[in-house]
Amino acid sequence: MRRLGSVQQKIPCVFLTEVRDEPSRKRDCQQFQVVATENVSPAALASDVHCAAATEKVDGTCCYVTTFNGEPYLWARLDRKPTKQADKRFKKYQYSQKTCKGFVWNVNEDFREVPEFWMAAHRVQHENGHPVPDEHGHIPGWVPVDHTNKQYCWHSSVVNYGTGVALVLKTHGEDEGQLEIVSVPLADLMEQTLELIGTNVNGNPYGLGSKKHPVHVLVPHGVLRIRNPPAVEFQQICSWFQECQEGRVEGIVWHCDDGMLIKIHRHHLGLKWPVADTFLNTRPVVVHVDESDADPCASEKDLFKSFSSVNRQTFSSVRDIQFEP
């Protein structure tokens, strides 16, 4: 399978969108809703979205693998966001104008400080050598995941820098009907973006692990192909989400041949998410994590140790993975 596009900016909706005067279903305290119209966006058409590879949009937090201090490293998504005052001005403008276009930022004063090693995502535009915000008022970027930073403890649980590996959920070989959790060298994931999912991420829509035994894994973007995707047409996509088992997902991301990524989220269509019995949980999963991938000095709650204890075992779904008490 060819490596699909990496997420280095906010992904645009496949349809043109409009702003409605109703509370957001996605963001608390946002008094307007961004919804899809029935018109496919010109950008999607220009990238030939009808011929693109359709993949499952996974609900987690975005990560990136690239070098840090000369070694392959996991980086966490951290958008540089406006100050409260600047954000208030931006939202007021967006609400009154029904668009973000035309709003003027003062990049030097309107944005919060970021950690020392923060870097802007690759596709962020620059003016006068400085990264500038996207249409949502954010500057997408990354920070390296350090084991000493408790803010990123769930990120760090899926990487072992000592052995240079990460815990990855993907399809099992050529069998897209089965999943596997495997330890993958970070060097093999270089310049890829992945989604961290699990017990303590985004409300855990897939039901992984428990408070006693949290479970987190990385899912490479584009790895979960949609075998029978709907045509890129408003009503067909709505029906697919509501009527097909394969449609019990957060959304679709189309990977176009020119590298462009296009998405649709259930919220764009006024549909509920999360849903019961997600499609991710309809497939069995086999574990391939060897004891040598774990740090011998780590605690018994170390994820690599936990997964190595069930090495070569198959579970009916990712939410059914259980470790010995």
From Swiss-Prot:
Reported function: Functions as an RNA ligase, in vitro. The ligation reaction entails three nucleotidyl transfer steps. In the first step, the RNA ligase reacts with ATP in the absence of nucleic acid to form a covalent ligase-AMP intermediate and release pyrophosphate. In step 2, the ligase-AMP binds to the nucleic acid and transfers the adenylate to the 5'-PO4 terminus to form an adenylylated intermediate. In step 3, the RNA ligase directs the attack of the 3'-OH on the 5'-phosphoanhydride linkage, resulting in a repaired 3'-5' phosphodiester and release of AMP.
Domain of life: Eukaryota
GO molecular function, one term: RNA ligase (ATP) activity
Annotated organism of origin: Danio rerio
Keyword annotations of the record: ATP-binding, Ligase, Nucleotide-binding, RNA repair
One of the protein's GO biological processes: response to reactive oxygen species
Record EC number: 6.5.1.3
Signal peptide bounds: none
A matching Pfam family: RLIG1
PANTHER family hit by this protein: CHROMOSOME 28 C12ORF29 HOMOLOG, RNA LIGASE 1
Protein modification: AMPylates itself (auto-AMPylation).
UniProt name for this protein: RNA ligase 1
Cofactor: Mg(2+); Mn(2+)
Coiled coil (UniProt feature): none
